[in-house]
Each structure stands twice: as structure tokens, then as C-alpha cells.
């Protein structure tokens, strides 16, 4: 091979490498631009855009909001804040006495109509769903909040999970959510169609997701899977109902003080139900921390930033995040078992 031929080959290799470098550079610029735009959207959604006006969902016009799991925690706070916005309410939960107390509180404070239904959704009886149908048959409903949910009593390996706990989680988080939505969503479609002729009212379906569904969670495997299912189901439903002027949103939360989380004190990362619901209703229809996900929102600012960092660095399905999650819940399990052992000794 002559010197000129060698020089020519070297030039061709250089052009090839140079082209590859430009491709890498272009992809890097695209990634940085996308990341920057997502971060700006995060900031706008969380802090700069005004609060959502619920008049478009029928607030103060006699329309009803149906809330499941409404007697405690996040569900109870949804009831309070939706009543404050002027919605009549249908509250569904297990404990009659708690529902009656909340009914009186909301009717006295906000002068709205509050209907209550006490059923145990874990029983998965047809009569439960018939009761919901009868109660809601003649009501102009525009909003549904699928809040009812259940987790494990403590973190537990899947192979040691009791069958009843496993079945209850799937029944409450998935089966009941789907069946109740099948009952209420047609009522929302009907109400919106009737109202659109006059006022352009929209419908809204909110479903509580979880970081447990966002990130695979060892030692909470059944709960994690049930919430991950809701992500795909809710996104699919959003695509189906958009033509009917119904907004469907999955709400992702990290820890919130509640009886289910067993956390009593709030902190920077752990809001109380009032703070969490306020941030949710302020930002309905905005992705906040879920910038890469359709029809999904992570509304509380600390949760949103946490999700953004995980998503844009390691990724929610990475081994390192899975391992960290496992260690975190393993430590919770150890503490819970020690506490249970101490209580047994006292007895």
C-alpha cells in the first residue's frame, strides 16, 4: 500500500470518527435540551402557574364528586377541600360513624349536600356495587376520586405474604377501583354531555397511585404491583375518555402522614393529608414531577423533585434503585418485628 493510499484511508477513518462525534454531540445537546425543558416545566407546574379553577368541572353548580375511602386521611381531606370548592359529595367508606361525623361537618361548614354509603370494599360483594349504583343513579356527577387503597401491614417477603392480605390488596386497589369507575364514569359522561350544551363543563377522574407503583418495591411486591397496574389502566382510560371531555389523572405520592403509612409526623419529604391534597387540586392536569408520563401527576413539590432526580439519573427500573428500596423496607420490617416482639413480652 502506497503512502498516498494510507493517507487516504486515514482520512476516511477520520471522517467516520468525526461524523460519529458529531452524532454523539447532537444527541448530548438533545438530551440536555430535553432535560432542561422538563425541569423548567416542573418549576412552572409546581410554583409559577396559577391554581386550577374547578368551575370547569362543575363547582358551585350543584354537581357531585364521588370519593372512595373518604372517612380518613387523604380521602377525608379530598372531601373537605372539594366541599370547600362547592361540590356536593358522595362519600364511600367502611365506617358509618366516621362518615356521619364528616357528613355533618361538611354540611354545616360549607352548606353542600353530602350523601354517605358505608360498605366494606374488601368483601367484594355484588350488593356493594348495587348500593353505589342506586345511590348515584339520579345524581349529576362530574368528578370521581378513586382514593380507597390498602398496603401490607408491614413490609413482607412475597413468599411469606398471607393469602388474605394479598387478596385484600388486589380487591381494594384494583378490582374495586375498576368496578366503581365502571359505575361512575358513564354518569360523568352523561352529565358532561348534558352540560356541554350550556356551559362546556368537563369531567374528572382522579386515581391515587404511589411511588410503590412508580418504582418496583421489594417487600411490598403485591402492593407495588397493584399500583403499577393502576398506572397503565389510568393512562389507557385517559386515552379512551378524552373524546368525552373527561380528564383522567393518576396521582403519584411518596409518603404522606396517614393510618396506612403509619407515619404521624410530617416533614419536608412527608406532607400531611391537607398539604398533599391542596397541592393535588392546585395542579390537576399538570404533570409536575411526572414530566415523562402522560395523564400522570406528582403534585407535592418534594415528591416531584425526588421523582425527577431518580427518573433522570438512575431510572426507576435500575438495579441500584431496587437495591436501595429493598434496604429501606428491610429496615422498616426489622423495626416493626422488634416492636411486635416487645409488645408480646409486655403482655
UniProtKB/Swiss-Prot annotation:
- Per the Swiss-Prot or TrEMBL record, the active site comprises 223, 227
Q: Where in the cell is it found?
A: Endoplasmic reticulum membrane
PROSITE patterns assigned to the protein according to its UniProt record, in alphabetical order: ADH_SHORT
Grouped into one coarse class, the protein's main location is endoplasmic reticulum
Q: What is its membrane topology? A: Single-pass membrane protein
Single GO biological process annotation from the record: fatty acid elongation
Tell me what reaction this enzyme catalyses: a very-long-chain (3R)-3-hydroxyacyl-CoA + NADP(+) = a very-long-chain 3-oxoacyl-CoA + NADPH + H(+)
Which EC number(s) does the record attach to this protein? Answer: 1.1.1.330
Q: What class of enzyme is it?
A: oxidoreductase
Its biological purpose: Component of the microsomal membrane bound fatty acid elongation system, which produces the 26-carbon very long-chain fatty acids (VLCFA) from palmitate. Catalyzes the reduction of the 3-ketoacyl-CoA intermediate that is formed in each cycle of fatty acid elongation. VLCFAs serve as precursors for ceramide and sphingolipids.
Assembly and interaction partners: Interacts with the fatty acid elongation system components ELO3 and TSC13.
Q: What is this protein called?
A: Very-long-chain 3-oxoacyl-CoA reductase
Amino acid at each position: 500500500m502506497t503512502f498516498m493510499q494510507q493517507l487516504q484511508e486515514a482520512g476516511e477513518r477520520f471522517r467516520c470518527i468525526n461524523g460519529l462525534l458529531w452524532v454523539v454531540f447532537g444527541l448530548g445537546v438533545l438530551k440536555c435540551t430535553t432535560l432542561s425543558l422538563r425541569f423548567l416545566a416542573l418549576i412552572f407546574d409546581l410554583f409559577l402557574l396559577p391554581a386550577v379553577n374547578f368551575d370547569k368541572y362543575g363547582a358551585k353548580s350543584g354537581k357531585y364528586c364521588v370519593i372512595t375511602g373518604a372517612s380518613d386521611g387523604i380521602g377525608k381531606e379530598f372531601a373537605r377541600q372539594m366541599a370547600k370548592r362547592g361540590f356536593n359529595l358522595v362519600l364511600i367508606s367502611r365506617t358509618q360513624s366516621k362518615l356521619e361525623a364528616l357528613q355533618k361537618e361538611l354540611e354545616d361548614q360549607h352548606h353542600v349536600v353530602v350523601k354517605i354509603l358505608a360498605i366494606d370494599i374488601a368483601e367484594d360483594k355484588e350488593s356493594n356495587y348495587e348500593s353505589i349504583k342506586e345511590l348515584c343513579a339520579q345524581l349529576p356527577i362530574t368528578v370521581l376520586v378513586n382514593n380507597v387503597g390498602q398496603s401490607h401491614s408491614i413490609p413482607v417477603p412475597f413468599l411469606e405474604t398471607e393469602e388474605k392480605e394479598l387478596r385484600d390488596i388486589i380487591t381494594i386497589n384494583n378490582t374495586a377501583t375498576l368496578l366503581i369507575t365502571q359505575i361512575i364514569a358513564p354518569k360523568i359522561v352523561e352529565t358532561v354531555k348534558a352540560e356541554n350544551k350550556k356551559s362546556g363543563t368537563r369531567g374528572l377522574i382522579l386515581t391515587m397511585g404511589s411511588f410503590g407503583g412508580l418504582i418496583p418495591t421489594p417487600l411490598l411486591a403485591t402492593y407495588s404491583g397493584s399500583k403499577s397496574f393502576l398506572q397503565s389502566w389510568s393512562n389507557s382510560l385517559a386515552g379512551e375518555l378524552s373524546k368525552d371531555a373527561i380528564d383522567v389523572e393518576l396521582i403519584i405520592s411518596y409518603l404522606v402522614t396517614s393510618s396506612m403509612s403509619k407515619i404521624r409526623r410530617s416533614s419536608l419529604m412527608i406532607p400531611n393529608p391537607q398539604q398533599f391534597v391542596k397541592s393535588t387540586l392546585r395542579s390537576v392536569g399538570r404533570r409536575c414531577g411526572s414530566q415523562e408520563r402522560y395523564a400522570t401527576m406528582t403534585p407535592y413539590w418534594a415528591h416531584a423533585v425526588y421523582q425527577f432526580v431518580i427518573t433522570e439519573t438512575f431510572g426507576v427500573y435500575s438495579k441500584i434503585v431496587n437495591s436501595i428500596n429493598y434496604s429501606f423496607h428491610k429496615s422498616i420490617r426489622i423495626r416493626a418485628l422488634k416492636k411486635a416482639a416487645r409488645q408480646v413480652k409486655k403482655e
